[in-house]
């Protein structure tokens, strides 16, 4: 299977969907290739309240509207895994597990995913009460109490934010502590953590599964072999100019795959 497009967008998250809307509306023949599900990581967010013009929605609803909008302008979508990119020539080729596709231009929009800490049960319970949290203070709006596990002797964030966390009556901070394991069957029921200095282990259990584990250990870019030949920084994020162009002609970057300070839906689009 081999087809020719004006532009191929790799990644069906907010950045890829926004690019598809604009490309398709400009009457470019557009293909969006997404490995897992259209919408990206934001689809597991039940409440989005900071997207301009939308008072409140879910991540799934927001990206579904983006997809429908792109489709209304003629964009095509393909659920497939992009395995290889050939970007040097005037005609670009994207090899997937469902065939090879050609285009005059390619937009890399694979995004970034939360970095895994490596405790037992992390992969099994991802998406079932797991999310990245920018700060513990935000969680106190919804939780009766928040316990923060810090691997080192202190926070590495700005002192003003750290002080606010330390003073908060709903937050307990445990330093030199690492999460070892979570589990419980269909839902999260227990967590085991260890003091890195003393080796003492603590098992926290709840009979009614009324707790969650929120992992915030930064992000890692998604790219791998697809970014071969493209300039990236030391962490693997795509280097682009002010117009989102990469070091190769006809290849652009969009969204969280690119170097940026803030990773939100509104900055991705």
Go through each PLM region and give its residues.
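Phosphate-coordination loops involved in phosphoryl transfer and adenosine-cofactor binding
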Residues: 4-6, 79-80, 176, 248
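FAD-site-proximal beta/loop scaffold in flavoenzymes
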Residues: 113, 118, 123-130, 215-267
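Beta1-alpha1 glycine-rich phosphate/pyrophosphate-binding loop at the start
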Residues: 3-73, 133-158, 174, 233
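Short, hinge-like loop/turn segments at secondary-structure boundaries
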Residues: 48-52, 125-126, 164-167
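Short amphipathic alpha-helical segments
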Residues: 20-22, 44, 118-122, 137-138, ...
């Amino acid at each position: 299977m081999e087809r020719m497009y004006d532009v191929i967008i790799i990644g069906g998250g907010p950045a890829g969907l926004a690019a598809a809307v604009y490309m398709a509306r400009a009457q470019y023949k557009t293909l969006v290739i997404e490995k897992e599900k259209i919408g990206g990581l934001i689809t597991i967010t039940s409440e989005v309240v900071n997207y301009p013009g939308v008072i409140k929605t879910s991540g799934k609803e927001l990206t579904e509207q983006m997809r429908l909008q792109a489709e209304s302008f003629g964009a095509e979508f393909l659920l497939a895994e992009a395995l290889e990119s050939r970007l040097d020539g005037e005609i670009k080729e994207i090899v997937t597990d469902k065939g090879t596709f050609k285009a005059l231009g390619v937009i890399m929009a694979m995004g970034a995913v939360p970095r895994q800490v490596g405790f037992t049960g992390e992969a099994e319970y991802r998406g079932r009460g797991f999310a990245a949290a920018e700060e513990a203070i935000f969680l106190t709006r919804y939780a009766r109490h928040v316990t923060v596990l810090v691997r080192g002797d202190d926070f590495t964030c700005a002192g003003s934010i750290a002080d606010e966390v330390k003073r908060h009556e709903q937050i307990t901070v445990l330093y030199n502590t690492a999460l070892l394991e979570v589990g419980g069957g269909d839902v999260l029921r227990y967590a085991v953590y260890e003091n890195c200095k003393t080796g003492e282990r603590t098992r926290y259990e709840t009979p009614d599964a009324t707790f969650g584990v929120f992992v915030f250990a930064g992000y890692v870019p998604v790219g791998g072999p697809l970014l071969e030949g493209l300039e990236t920084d030391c962490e693997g994020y795509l280097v682009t100019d002010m117009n989102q162009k990469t070091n190769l002609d006809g290849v652009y970057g969009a969204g969280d795959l690119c170097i940026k300070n803030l990773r939100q839906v509104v900055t991705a689009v």
